[in-house]
């Protein structure tokens, strides 16, 4: 099944980019690595959200980007980011995402907007629909704290309004944040935490990432780490989590 998903993911990325001719060398720029939503159900006691927002790294991108992420739980995420309008410092882009469960059935779909700054700061808003749950509306921000030729440090935060379809279950919020570190666009790490007061639940993550391959238009990134959640009734162990992301930039820079 994993091999099938790997082949399917590569076909989706390559077929999308094959329609365009790339005229610019993007070597040295950071590549889109979307945080795909995991879309488990709230009532099953599993994480029901992720930072489903893509924000730019220190260099603002002016080309369309597509990505496929294969997760260790068998799920799969597709992401797209298409520039709409911008100038030398800021770019406004349209976002799109589709997440599939381990049976390749739709787990969520989302659309949104992202505003990226050349210095690595960004804002985004995204609306997601989760079959069997309801809708989620997420606003997120990212600030590039430090950047030079070797090191990059960013802080991020988000708030998600969860709007379940279940009778007698009110809307509720999830808030969270984290810190990302990258060394020479090759090796990095991230720490994250989220809090859902309505469920009296906290989620934690500690991840590492490695850029396996990079060309002017293509990037392959591996991430691995641990996640856990705490509630008054149950506390999970630190569970291993890993994924592989294929990213592709295509089209002419405008």
UniProtKB/Swiss-Prot annotation:
One of its GO terms (cellular component) is extracellular region. Residues 19-62 form a propeptide. One of its GO terms (biological process) is innate immune response. It is found in: Secreted. Its main location: secreted. Keywords: Antibiotic, Antimicrobial, Cleavage on pair of basic residues, Immunity, Innate immunity, Secreted, Signal. It holds the Pfam family Attacin_N. Residues 1-18 form the signal peptide. Belongs to the attacin/sarcotoxin-2 family. Hemolymph antibacterial protein. This is Attacin-A. It comes from Trichoplusia ni. The lineage of its organism: Eukaryota, Metazoa, Ecdysozoa, Arthropoda, Hexapoda.
């Amino acid at each position: 099944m994993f091999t099938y998903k790997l082949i399917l993911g590569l076909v989706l990325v390559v077929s999308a980019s094959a329609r365009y001719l790339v005229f610019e060398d993007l070597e040295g720029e950071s590549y889109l690595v979307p945080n795909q939503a995991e879309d488990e159900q709230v009532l099953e006691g599993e994480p029901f959200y992720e930072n489903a927002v893509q924000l730019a790294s220190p260099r603002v991108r002016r080309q369309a980007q597509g990505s496929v992420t294969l997760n260790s739980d068998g799920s799969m995420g597709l992401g797209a980011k298409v520039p709409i309008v911008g100038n030398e410092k800021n770019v406004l882009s349209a976002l799109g995402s589709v997440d599939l469960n381990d049976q390749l059935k739709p787990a969520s779909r989302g659309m949104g907007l992202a505003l990226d700054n050349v210095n690595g700061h960004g804002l985004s808003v995204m609306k997601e629909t989760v079959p069997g749950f309801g809708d989620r509306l997420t606003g997120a921000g990212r600030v590039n704290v430090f950047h030079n030729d070797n090191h990059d440090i960013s802080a991020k935060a988000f708030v998600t309004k969860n709007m379940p379809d279940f009778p007698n279950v009110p809307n509720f919020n999830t808030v969270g944040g984290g810190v990302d570190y990258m060394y020479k666009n090759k090796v990095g790490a991230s720490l994250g935490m989220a809090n859902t007061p309505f469920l009296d639940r906290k989620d934690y993550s500690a991840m590492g990432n490695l850029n396996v391959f990079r060309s002017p238009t293509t990037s392959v990134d591996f991430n691995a780490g641990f996640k856990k959640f705490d509630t008054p009734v149950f506390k999970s162990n630190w569970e291993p989590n890993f994924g592989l992301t294929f990213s592709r930039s295509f089209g002419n820079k405008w």
